[in-house]
């Protein structure tokens, strides 16, 4: 099977959203267990199904030992051209505000920019709705590829702890990261503060480029240092305690949005 023919197809790994003639990645099956929804998937007539299970209808399946590894391999080829300046913002509170203010500031200064997060997908003063703080991996990649084609090289993404644990930022590298704050939250999912912090630190351990910048305050800097993040090849840009040279001229609020 030629790789070129595969990367020309739209990708999917969610059987609920699968469309006809898309390339489907079966992350559920393994050598011994088959995906319980495989019949429903076949009814949707995908182009091919990448799987680890030896199904009988061989003409419709591509057998791979590790589907996830093959998925990442194809993604790197299909999405090789993405915006150069990617910023990730994480933290218990403030992610949405920071992402939205970043987008507004660059837009006001006539710098093409995009934002992905709780409020949705923003680019060139346009908007698309999103149901998740950090959308799934393919939605992010498709959006970033789209804005790159429209000459947008700056984008900020909200990196939620759920999204980080679930690998929604796979195949992305960030030059800059912002850690707003850290306090008790989402313990129904993470079970403990240690687990919650570990989820946040995935961003800094896995998705930052070398010599990237981490923007945070003194408390977060100490937290990162304690977890050996600052020992890596990063620049820590600490929040200044001095008065900032900004003045609030006006602001308007609408639903979840605030415009400064």
Please identify what each model-predicted range represents:
Residues 44-49, 59, 83-84, 207-213, ...:
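A short helix->loop->beta-strand "cap" motif at the edges of active sites that frequently abuts
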Residues 1-73, 77, 247:
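N-terminal leader/targeting and accessory segments in enzymes
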Residues 25, 50, 61-62, 87, ...:
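Hydrophobic/aromatic beta-strand patches that form the interior of the parallel beta-sheet core
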Residues 2-6, 137, 184, 190-197, ...:
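Adenine nucleotide phosphate-binding catalytic loops in nucleotide-utilizing enzymes
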Residues 30, 62-63, 132-135, 188, ...:
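Pocket-edge positions in alpha/beta enzyme catalytic cores
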Residues 2, 47, 57-68, 128-131, ...:
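Active-site regions of enzymes building and remodeling cell-envelope glycoconjugates
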């Amino acid at each position: 099977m030629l790789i070129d023919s595969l990367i020309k197809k739209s990708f999917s790994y969610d059987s609920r959203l699968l469309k006809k003639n898309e390339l489907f990645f079966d992350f559920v099956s393994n050598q011994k267990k088959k995906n319980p929804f495989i019949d429903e998937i076949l009814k949707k007539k995908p182009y091919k199904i990448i799987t680890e299970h030896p199904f009988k209808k061989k003409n419709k399946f591509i057998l791979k030992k590790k589907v996830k590894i093959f998925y990442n391999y194809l993604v790197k080829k299909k999405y090789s051209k993405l915006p150069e300046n990617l910023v990730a913002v994480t933290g218990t509170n403030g992610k949405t505000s920071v992402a939205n203010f970043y987008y507004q500031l660059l837009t006001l200064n006539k710098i093409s920019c995009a934002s992905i997060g709780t409020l949705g997908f923003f680019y060139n003063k346009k908007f698309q709705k999103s149901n998740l703080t950090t959308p799934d991996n393919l939605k992010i990649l498709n959006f970033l590829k789209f804005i790159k084609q429209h000459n947008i090289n700056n984008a900020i993404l909200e990196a939620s702890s759920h999204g980080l644990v679930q690998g929604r930022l796979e195949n992305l590298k960030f030059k800059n990261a912002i850690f707003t704050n850290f306090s008790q939250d989402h313990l129904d999912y993470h079970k403990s503060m240690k687990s919650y912090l570990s989820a946040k630190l995935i961003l800094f351990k896995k998705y930052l480029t070398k010599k990237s910048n981490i923007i945070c305050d003194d408390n977060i800097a100490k937290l990162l240092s304690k977890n050996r993040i600052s020992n890596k090849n990063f620049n820590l840009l600490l929040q200044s305690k001095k008065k900032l040279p900004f003045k609030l001229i006006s602001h308007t609020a609408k639903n979840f949005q605030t415009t400064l």
